[in-house]
């Protein structure tokens, strides 16, 4: 079994754990519909992605 040679300092432990926190999801306002959507995702209301129609729009 592997055993650490030195004690991990609180600073190093904190730096390792800094990526463990949950982050709130990011939303942006769509330019065309004004709806909130995730960046780099299809706008489900209009079916548009990067200026092109990908899905049929929802009514």
Swiss-Prot record:
Source organism superkingdom: Bacteria
Biased composition (Basic residues): 1-16
Renumbered residue ranges of the record's region Disordered: 1-59
GO biological process, one term: translation
Cellular component, GO annotation: large ribosomal subunit
Transmembrane segments: none
Residue ranges with Basic and acidic residues bias: 28-44
UniProt key word rRNA-binding: no
Name of the protein in its database record: Large ribosomal subunit protein bL32
Biological source species: Bartonella quintana (strain Toulouse)
Gene: rpmF
